[in-house]
Amino acid sequence: GIYLFADGRIQSYEDCSTKEEGINHIYDVKAGEKKINEIKFVPDIGNEGDDLSLRFLFVINPDTVPDKESFVYAHDTNMNQVYPINIHMNVESKNKGGTEKNIVLCKEMTQEEYDSKVYDKYGKYRNTLDTADFVMKNNNDEEIQNYIKTDNGVLNFVIEGCGGNNDYYNITAYINGVVLEKDIFNAIFQIQRGRYITKKAFDVDLTKLDKNKYKLGEYNSLFFVAVPE
């Protein structure tokens, strides 16, 4: 699966070979095979004269859903991102540069938070101050797995971020490879270097999702992507 981001915002794009448009295009690539695809899109952010950061995210087997509990199970163990490319806007974006930001501001870390370490995707402890790191937790401040299994259609979780350089990060969440639209989930984190942390709780109404994409009472994959604006 290939996703496209402009200044951290996910973009819908057209695959010129199939004429299909969407935020995620899935390609079947055999071992040792090389594929070249032409795409086109109109950014939904940016004004004339702006320079936007363009990033692609590759997710291997995006339709895979876990069938058992596993700490290390997550699509981010199979993610690859190319280096950002800057594009120059010669015209206004299709929404004339409109921005609907839900910014989560930083707060000063407590000493306990400052001294703490978190698991990386391989289950190893590491400090988060040198590089930006985001953790998904439940409301009891416990890290949760990258799968979800709910019976009532409501998902409650907290995203916590810290470390790295001063920057804004656009958070995009996916369930079974399908993006959660902005009316369901929308957040931009502001990271400040040093002893600062961002934290925001989310209550996601999964009943708004396509019933063919999310199954109540069954395991569903959940991951989110933090991309600098």
Set out the residue ranges of the language-model regions:
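Short strand-turn-strand beta-turns centered on an Asx-Gly dipeptide
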Residues: 7-8, 175-180
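N-terminal edge beta-strand
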Residues: 116-150
